[in-house]
């Protein structure tokens, strides 16, 4: 996990934003790219480069989502009725690992994925160990009783002063939450400007 944490901070500096809003993020101290020419602000980025960076920022924010998975989610969003960008975000935010992270059950998206894959999360009363499971309105997420006291969970509970997004509800004493509805882009608490329109334009080429 330490290796993952270090690499995620490098990603923040490389992409020029704090990807998860973490106070420990090295980007908050050195808000320029790593490397010899990191502080050179005269380097121009091409139109394609801007679109690519927007995609990389959004994909990295969701942790270990592969490029193939990310593109498949976009293609599904494109086939749905309504706005493709809003559909895209709705699908990303309905993933089980994302919901666990947004509920502050885990301190990072990486830890959320680990909790799910290790079988520590229940969905509607049953063990759920696939991070990419898509939740539906009314689905209930719960931490298994046997691990409610582990340090990772307790650390995250201390952060419950953070606001749970309005498309979720969460009860701290029982460590149980509910997926209330599909969110809009404006509902999602990204710590950076999520330029979803650029991602859509990139994948639509």
Curated annotation (Swiss-Prot):
UniProt GO BP: ribosomal small subunit biogenesis; translation
A Pfam family matched in the record: Ribosomal_S4
Gene Ontology MF, one: structural constituent of ribosome
Residue ranges the record marks as coiled coil: none
Gene Ontology CC: small ribosomal subunit
Lineage: superkingdom: Bacteria
Domain S4 RNA-binding: 94-157
InterPro entries listed in its UniProt record: Ribosomal_uS4, Ribosomal_uS4_bac-type, Ribosomal_uS4_CS, Ribosomal_uS4_N, S4_RNA-bd, S4_RNA-bd_sf
Swiss-Prot/TrEMBL keywords: Ribonucleoprotein, Ribosomal protein, RNA-binding, rRNA-binding
Job of this protein: One of the primary rRNA binding proteins, it binds directly to 16S rRNA where it nucleates assembly of the body of the 30S subunit. With S5 and S12 plays an important role in translational accuracy.
NCBIfam families for this protein: PRK05327.1, rpsD_bact
Family membership noted in the UniProt record: Belongs to the universal ribosomal protein uS4 family.
Subunit details: Part of the 30S ribosomal subunit. Contacts protein S5. The interaction surface between S4 and S5 is involved in control of translational fidelity.
Protein's UniProt name: Small ribosomal subunit protein uS4
Biological classification of the source: Bacteria, Pseudomonadati, Pseudomonadota, Alphaproteobacteria, Rickettsiales
């Amino acid at each position: 996990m330490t290796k993952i944490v270090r690499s995620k901070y490098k990603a923040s500096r490389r992409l020029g934003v704090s990807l998860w809003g973490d106070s420990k993020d090295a980007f908050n101290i050195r808000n320029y790219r790593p490397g010899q020419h990191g502080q050179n602000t005269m380097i121009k980025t091409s139109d394609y480069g801007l679109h690519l960076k927007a995609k990389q920022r959004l994909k990295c924010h969701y942790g270990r989502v592969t490029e193939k998975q990310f593109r498949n989610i976009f293609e599904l969003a494109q086939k749905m009725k309504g706005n493709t960008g809003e559909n895209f975000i709705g699908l990303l935010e309905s993933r089980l690992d994302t919901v666990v992270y947004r509920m502050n059950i885990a301190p990072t998206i990486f830890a959320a994925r680990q909790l799910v894959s290790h079988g520590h999360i229940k969905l509607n009363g049953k063990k759920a160990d696939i991070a990419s499971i898509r939740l539906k309105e009314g689905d209930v997420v719960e931490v298994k009783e046997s691990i409610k006291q582990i340090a990772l969970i307790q650390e995250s509970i201390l952060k419950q002063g953070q606001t749970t997004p309005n498309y979720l509800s969460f009860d701290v004493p029982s460590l149980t939450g509910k997926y209330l509805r599909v969110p809009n882009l404006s509902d999602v608490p990204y710590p950076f400007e999520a330029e979803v329109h650029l991602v859509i334009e990139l994948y639509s080429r």
